[in-house]
Regions:
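Short strand-turn segments of transmembrane beta-barrel domains in outer membranes
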Residues: 208-216, 225-260, 277, 285
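Transmembrane beta-barrel wall of Gram-negative outer-membrane proteins
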Residues: 246-282, 286-325, 349-366, 424, ...
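Gram-negative outer-membrane beta-barrel transporters
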Residues: 418, 586-589, 605-685, 760-764
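C-terminal beta-signal and adjacent terminal beta-strands/loops
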Residues: 628, 680-681, 702-765
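Short, acidic, small-residue-rich periplasmic hinge/interaction motif at the N-terminus
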Residues: 28, 32, 40-44, 73-77, ...
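Membrane-embedded beta-barrel scaffold of Gram-negative outer-membrane proteins
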Residues: 364, 370-388, 529, 535-543, ...
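Short acidic/polar hinge/loop motifs at secondary-structure boundaries
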Residues: 181-211, 229-230, 556
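Face-selective signature of the C-terminal outer-membrane beta-barrel domain
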Residues: 304, 308-318, 350-501, 527-529, ...
Length: 765
């Protein structure tokens, strides 16, 4: 299969016409002279285009000789147009300097020629400019239609809901930061566990959102979509920030620019380097103090080593520990056993840490090809004490468990080769990608009592490897119609060597095995530019559902990599200059839906599922500084082989909407009033237990000057009682009445945040 990919790519890229020209250069801020990343660059009236990279560099290749108008623009910058004359065989360089201006949605374009599958780019760019980012939760909420829930004192990864999926902690949504994968394969707590708390929100510069299985560079975990976060290449200024709030909350942040505008480290060409550190503490709003502590550190260097080579180095460290109150049963609150913010087992909690190192080398080769290579390493530890069923299994010691990872090592490489090839009057953009990821970890699941280990359920050593390759081709068939076709090939090796307790005898028995499986995932997407303000798209693609190595070895499902098939039609359009709308009608079928059972260390196959829905996102500029936004999402999902009276997909969101009104000024007062709503939905197969919906208001206010900023954030302005994480669970309580041994199956929940006020102050230097 690798050979077929390479041959297909060679045939595509060697069909080039002769004597074409190349235009390359740098986009910089007109005041500071600093290179700017993410600026759209293209030739007026011509299909295709590109965006400046981390060093502000851009390249347009395979151009016919002639005179063009080069346009460059980005949100918050005044668009610039420059006439350019190119000769056959010429490679011309130039520098574009763009000036800042007030944000104007009239400047937003509806297409992304270099990355057409990023149809939410316009929406995402607007949100990144308008919404303040103060937490990992804020970052994830930038994904249109995505909802999150936290249910362990702030220490665990958030539960994610998107496109009719309860993604658990990341099973069906792939997350990365600077090319580093966040999701954990075969994690001891949940497949695809995506703990994003090691990211300092103020360092994030860009988010790319891809919904559905339509993009070839995403494989594992990307059933419902993927989010690519990118940290800043450079700081506009150094910053010190302090935040204090209710419930003993404190946060400190320090970000230092190490090079400024005129210092150099490895070369005399453009370079940047900075460090950032964050400390956070809170006791939270529960009756039992949570003692949550987190530290984050980041260092990043980006530099142009030569005219054709750039290097990015990144290192980060994160550590966290906490106590938790866990999910509580409704009957416990109703009968007065505990308060709404109480706990059945106050000894829950955990600790975790992650250290990352990454190097990215980007090289411009002959024929205007670009080779990008990344190597990365992560070291990860995790230990979590939970009690999901209280005294259902053991009426004396209780049902507390400890899920632990000891020394997970992640080794990875990704490489892409990009090239533009002239095919007559058209330019074919080809990307050949290859990569591998290896996870090596100790996984333990044990019984515990008040955080003291009592016996082992399963334990062993994980080795899991993914090798992948893909070929992605984008070709403008006409001036309006663009074709994107791709194919991805994945190979997985699942290896687990350990023990498993016999359910009858409780004796530990060997659990060992090794299995290799592969899968091919083709994609086909069409984009039609109906007018400068209307783009239509039709997308389709195969993907696959992720799987846990322990479930694979135990034979939980004959189909190791269940297929996913998705379709989508929609449009990004501007009915008036100041209104941007993205709308999509989508469908997704899963061959089998796999659910990880955390307290058993196994995987449950719930059978095939079918989902469809409608996503609408709109951004409107009411005046020069006033903006309105809303996302509305409807999802319908069912288990297709289950009886009609028991075919719901538990916890799958049905209707969600978020939105807000924002006043944004470059200096002085800014503010935002926002809402979020998720509808009630079935929590079990037959819908007899329902997770309760909520409607909340949040607010942000800030005052900014050149050297300082002060602000306030308020969550749940109306102090509504709401449930954050919710599950249908069978549990038993040791109340004075001694509940029946079989316990009760009902809704369990983690209470949502009450009114929560935080104040912050920043100094820029």
């Amino acid at each position: 299969m690798h050979g077929l990919l390479v041959v297909a790519w060679l045939l595509a890229t060697n069909a080039s016409a002769q004597n074409t020209a190349t235009l390359r250069g740098i986009v910089a801020d007109s005041l500071s002279g600093q290179p700017l990343a993410g600026v759209s660059v293209g030739l007026q009236g011509q299909p295709g285009g590109t965006a400046s990279d981390a060093l502000g560099q851009f390249r347009l290749g395979g151009l016919a000789a002639g005179t063009y108008t080069l346009r460059a623009g980005a949100l918050g910058y005044r668009a610039q147009a420059v006439p350019v004359t190119l000769k056959a065989g010429e490679s011309q360089r130039l520098t574009l300097r763009v000036a800042t201006t007030t944000l104007s949605l009239a400047e937003v374009t509806v297409s992304q020629p270099r990355d057409p599958n990023q149809s939410l780019a316009a929406i995402s760019h607007i949100d990144q400019v308008l919404r303040p980012m103060n937490s990992a939760q804020d970052l994830l909420r930038l994904v249109p239609g995505l909802f999150i829930a936290q249910h362990a004192g702030g220490g665990k990864a958030e539960q994610i809901f998107l496109r009719g999926f309860d993604c658990d902690h990341g099973t069906d949504f792939a997350v990365s930061i600077d090319g580093l994968p966040v999701n954990m394969v075969s994690h001891t707590h949940g497949q695809g566990y995506a703990d994003f708390h090691f990211v300092i929100p103020e360092t994030v510069e860009q988010l790319k959102v891809y919904k559905g299985p339509y993009t070839a560079r995403f494989g594992d975990f990307a059933t419902s979509g993927a989010g690519e976060f990118v940290t800043k290449t450079r700081l506009d200024h150094s910053q010190a920030k302090i935040e204090v709030g209710q419930f003993d909350t404190f946060r400190g942040l320090l970000m230092l620019d190490l090079l400024g505008n005129d210092r150099h480290l490895l070369s005399k060409k453009p370079e940047s380097a900075y460090v950032a550190a964050e400390y956070y503490f809170t006791n939270s709003y529960f009756d039992a103090k949570q003692h949550f502590k987190r530290f984050n550190g980041l260092a990043k260097y980006t530099g142009q080593l030569s005219d054709n080579t750039s290097l990015t180095l990144l290192g980060s460290h994160f550590t966290s520990n906490w106590d938790a109150s866990g999910q509580i049963p409704e009957r416990g609150v109703r009968e007065g056993v505990i308060s709404r913010f109480g706990s059945i087992d106050p000894t829950e909690g955990g600790r975790t840490s992650r250290t990352n190192a990454s190097a990215i080398l980007t090289t411009t080769l002959g024929h205007d090809a670009v080779l990008r290579q990344q190597v990365y390493y992560s070291r990860y530890d995790f230990s979590l004490f939970s009690n999901f069923t209280f005294f259902l299994q053991d009426s004396v010691k209780g049902d507390e468990i400890n899920q632990r990872e000891t020394g997970r090592n992640i080794y990875g490489y990704t490489g892409t080769y990009d090239r533009d090839t002239r095919l007559g009057a058209r330019t074919l953009h080809s990307t050949l990608g290859m990569g591998t990821r290896i996870d090596d970890a100790g996984l333990d699941l044990r019984h515990a009592q008040r955080r003291q280990i009592t016996d082992t359920i399963t334990a062993g050593r994980l080795f899991e490897q993914n090798i992948n390759a893909y070929l992605d081709e984008t070709l403008p068939l006409t001036d309006r119609l663009t074709l994107n076709a791709a194919v991805r090939f994945d190979v997985f090796t699942f290896d687990f060597r350990g023990v498993l307790a016999n359910e009858a005898t409780k004796e530990l028995e060997p659990l060992r095995g090794r299995l290799t499986r592969s899968i091919v995932s083709p994609k086909l997407n069409l984009y039609y530019q109906l007018s400068p303000t209307v783009q239509l798209f039709a997308r389709s693609g195969f993907g696959f559902h992720s799987n846990d190595a322990r479930g694979v070895i135990r034979g939980a499902n004959e189909t190791v990599l269940p297929r996913a098939l998705g379709y989508e039609v929609g449009s990004t359009f501007k009915p008036v200059p100041n209104l941007v709308v993205n709308a999509a009608l989508w469908s997704l079928h899963l061959q089998n839906e796999l659910v990880y059972i955390g307290d058993d260390g196994n995987v449950e196959n719930t059978g095939p599922t079918q989902r469809y829905g409608v996503d609408v996102a709109a951004r409107y500029q009411l005046s020069r500084r006033l903006f309105l936004d809303t996302d509305v999402n409807y999802n319908h999902g069912r288990q297709t082989d289950a009886p009609a009276d028991a075919n719901y997909i538990p916890l799958a969101p049905t209707f969600t909407t978020i939105g807000g009104l924002t006043y944004k000024a470059p200096k002085g007062l800014s503010g935002s009033l926002r809402y979020r709503h998720i509808d009630s939905r079935p929590a079990n197969d037959d819908g007899s237990i329902r997770a309760r919906g909520y409607f909340l208001f949040d607010a942000v206010l800030s005052y900014t000057k050149a050297r300082f900023q002060i602000g306030a954030t308020a969550e749940n302005l109306l102090n509504v009682q709401w449930n954050q994480a919710q599950f249908a669970t069978q549990t038993r309580l040791l109340t004075p009445q001694r509940e029946r041994p079989a316990g009760f199956d009902e809704l369990h929940f983690t209470p949502g945040t009450p009114f929560y006020l935080k104040l912050n102050a920043s100094v820029f230097f």
